[in-house]
C-alpha cells in the first residue's frame, strides 16, 4: 500500500481521493500494471517449466471490453461461459479460436452462436451436450472440438459454494462411478465430435496446493485407462484455476511459482510413471489474475452508534456492487483513503445503502475516527464484484477505471438513470380495463 505525504492512498500512481472526486463513488479502481504483471507471471512461470502451455483467463472473474483486450495483448486465451462473454471478447478484437466455451447447460442457441463465430473449444459438461453438439455440428457441416469436464472427487478446502471438484457437484462427469468413461466412449463414437482432452476444476480461493497434485494423478490415471480401453491419447489436460488471494491478514495465498512447481512437476511425474506422452497443459486463473488488483472506493455518509452494541457506518454502495459478503461471508481489509496514514481509533461495521438488512460490507473493522464525506477504500475487490453487481433497488452500477503510471482511464462508464429504464416497456394497451 502506497501513501503520499498528505496521507492519501495511492494506486497505480493515482491519488484515490482525487479519483473519487473526479469519477464519483462507488468506483471500481483497477491497477492495470499489476494485472499485466500477473498475466506475465503465469505465462513465464509455467512456460519456463513445461514445453506446451496455454493460460486461459477465467473471464467470469471480471470481464469488460478493455479487460478482454488486455488479456489478448498479454498473449492469453479466454475461458468464457456465455454468449455475452463471447460477444464481449469478439468486440474487443479477441479471435474466437482463443475462446474456450464452458457451461453446464449450453442451449442450442448458445451452441449455434459459438459455431457461427468459430469458437476454439467446447468444454463439455454432460452427455446430453455431446448429443446436441453432434447434431448441430452435423447440420452446419462442422466439427465440434471438445474438452470434457470431469469430476475427479478431490475435496478442496474452501467455501462450499465454490467447491467444484468433489463428487457431489453440478459440474462435470464423475470418474469413480463410470459416468466419465461412458461419456468418453460416447464422444469417441460420434461422427461430428473431436475429443481433445479432459478438464477439471477443484474449487476456488484455494490455499493448500496439494489437491492439485492429486487432481493431476486422478486425471492422468483416468486418461491412461481410456487409452487402454479405446486407444485414444489425451492431447490437452486442463486443470482449471482456483489459486487463492489475500482478502485479509488471515489469508496466506501461495505464490504462482509454487503452483507452477507442483502442477508441472506432477504432470511430468505421473505421465512418466504411466508411460504417457506429455499433454498440452492448460490453466484457467481468474480471481488470482485480478482479485487483489481491484479496490472499491465509497463515500461515507451516515453514522449510527448503538451504545454497548455496535457502531454502524453507511456508505454509498454495498451489496449492489459487492454481493460476496452476503453470498460467501467474504471478509475484506479497508482503509480511509484520505486518512491512510492514521492509526485505528474505533471499531465499526460498514453497512451498504440497499434496503436490505443483510447489506453489510465490513464487520467489526478497526479504522481511524470517521467523518462524513471520508473516502473508504476496500481492497481485493477485483474479482466477482463488478461481475456480480446488480441494479437492486434500481441503483446504477458503478464506473470502472484502470490506473497506470499516474493516469486514470474510464473502461466502464457509470450507469445513468436512463440506462436503468432503457429496456423497460409499458404496453400500449396497458390499463385496468
Model-derived regions: residue spans:
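Hydrophobic face of alpha-helices
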Residues: 36-39, 216, 260, 377
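Short acidic, glycine/serine/threonine-rich loops at helix termini
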Residues: 68, 91, 111-116, 133-136, ...
Amino acid at each position: 500500500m502506497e501513501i503520499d505525504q498528505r496521507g492519501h492512498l495511492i494506486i497505480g500512481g493515482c491519488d484515490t481521493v482525487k479519483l473519487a472526486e473526479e469519477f464519483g463513488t462507488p468506483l471500481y479502481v483497477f491497477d492495470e500494471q499489476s494485472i499485466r504483471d500477473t498475466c506475465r507471471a503465469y505465462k513465464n512461470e509455467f512456460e519456463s517449466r513445461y514445453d506446451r502451455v496455454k493460460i486461459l483467463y477465467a473471464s467470469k472473474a471480471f470481464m469488460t471490453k478493455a479487460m478482454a483486450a488486455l488479456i489478448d495483448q498479454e498473449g492469453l486465451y479466454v475461458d468464457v461461459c456465455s454468449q455475452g462473454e463471447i460477444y464481449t471478447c469478439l468486440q474487443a478484437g479477441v479471435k474466437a479460436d482463443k475462446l474456450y466455451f464452458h457451461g453446464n447447460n449450453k442451449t442450442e442457441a448458445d451452441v449455434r452462436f459459438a459455431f457461427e463465430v468459430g469458437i476454439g473449444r467446447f468444454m463439455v459438461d454432460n452427455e446430453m451436450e455431446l448429443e446436441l453438439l453432434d447434431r448441430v455440428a452435423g447440420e452446419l457441416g462442422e466439427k465440434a472440438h471438445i474438452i470434457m469436464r470431469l469430476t475427479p472427487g478431490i475435496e478442496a478446502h474452501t467455501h462450499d459454494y465454490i467447491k467444484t471438484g468433489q463428487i457431489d457437484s453440478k459440474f462435470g462427469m464423475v470418474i469413480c462411478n463410470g459416468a466419465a468413461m461412458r461419456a468418453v466412449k460416447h464422444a469417441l463414437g460420434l461422427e461430428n465430435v473431436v475429443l481433445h482432452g479432459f478438464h477439471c476444476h477443484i474449487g476456488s480461493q484455494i490455499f493448500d496446493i496439494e489437491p492439485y497434485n492429486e487432481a493431476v494423478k486422478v486425471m492422468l490415471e483416468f486418461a491412461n485407462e481410456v487409452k487402454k480401453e479405446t486407444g485414444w491419447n489425451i492431447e490437452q489436460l486442463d486443470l482449471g484455476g482456483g489459486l487463492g488471494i489475500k482478502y485479509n491478514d488471515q489469508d496466506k495465498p501461495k505464490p504462482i511459482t509454487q503452483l507452477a512447481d507442483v502442477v508441472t512437476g506432477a504432470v511430468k511425474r505421473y505421465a512418466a510413471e504411466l508411460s504417457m506422452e506429455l499433454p498440452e497443459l492448460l490453466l484457467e486463473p481468474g480471481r488470482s489474475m485480478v482479485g487483489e488488483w481491484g479496490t472499491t472506493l465509497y463515500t461515507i455518509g451516515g453514522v449510527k452508534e448503538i451504545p454497548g452494541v455496535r457502531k454502524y457506518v453507511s456508505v454509498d454502495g454495498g451489496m449492489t456492487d459487492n454481493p460476496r459478503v452476503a453470498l460467501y461471508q467474504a471478509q475484506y481489509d479497508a482503509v480511509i483513503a484520505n486518512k491512510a496514514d492514521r492509526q485505528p481509533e474505533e471499531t465499526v461495521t460498514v453497512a451498504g445503502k440497499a434496503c436490505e438488512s443483510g447489506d453489510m460490507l465490513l464487520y467489526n473493522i478497526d479504522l481511524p475516527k470517521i467523518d462524513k464525506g471520508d473516502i473508504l477504500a476496500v481492497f481485493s475487490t477485483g474479482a466477482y464484484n463488478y461481475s456480480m453487481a446488480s441494479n437492486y433497488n434500481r441503483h446504477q452500477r458503478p464506473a470502472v477505471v484502470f490506473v497506470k503510471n499516474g493516469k486514470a482511464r474510464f473502461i466502464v462508464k457509470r450507469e445513468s438513470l436512463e440506462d436503468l429504464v432503457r429496456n423497460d416497456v409499458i404496453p400500449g394497451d396497458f390499463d385496468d380495463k
